[in-house]
Amino acid sequence: MIKKEEKISNLFKYYFDIRMIRILLLGAISGFPWVLIGSSLSLWLKEEGLSRSTIGWAGLIFGVYAFNYLWAPLIDRIQIPFLTKKIGHRRGWIVLMQLVILISLILWSLINPSENLALLISIGLVIAIASSTQDITVDALRIEQVGENETKSMAAGAAMAVVGWWTAVSYTHLTLPTRSTVV
């Protein structure tokens, strides 16, 4: 019986590594933009009285996530001036993408969709590109932090990233106003 308890405690020790907490948080920051582009945008356009087909076309923004592998090699090679030297290559990209997402969200909040749908969709596309670029960088940082030779930690890191992502998505869904609470 003692051996089983030791095995279970050995299994969980990988999840309590400080690197896993960082990976969990990185997963969470990857989840927030996904909900904003998806659920929030759909709700916003619906509240503005736009048609279902228009809302459906706006959903094509998600297509960016399917093609982020195309610019992943560029992310590995291009260094962000000042940030790369100060905080490192991957963290520099993450901070830059967070800044792009923040600025885009501020601009997004100032747009009336029924008056300027093209600009709204364009900024949504910028958010999606920045978010998918951030996802590339978060995954690369996770792999670098854990190390390819630590297979159990690598598996725990992948799990923590997914848990972080889903936690952010779930939390955002729970805290967003629903149709009945939108004034």
Briefly describe each language-model feature range.
Residues 78-97:
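Cytoplasmic membrane-interface "Motif A"-like loop-to-helix N-cap segments
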Residues 57-79:
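Central cavity-lining transmembrane alpha-helices of secondary-active solute carriers
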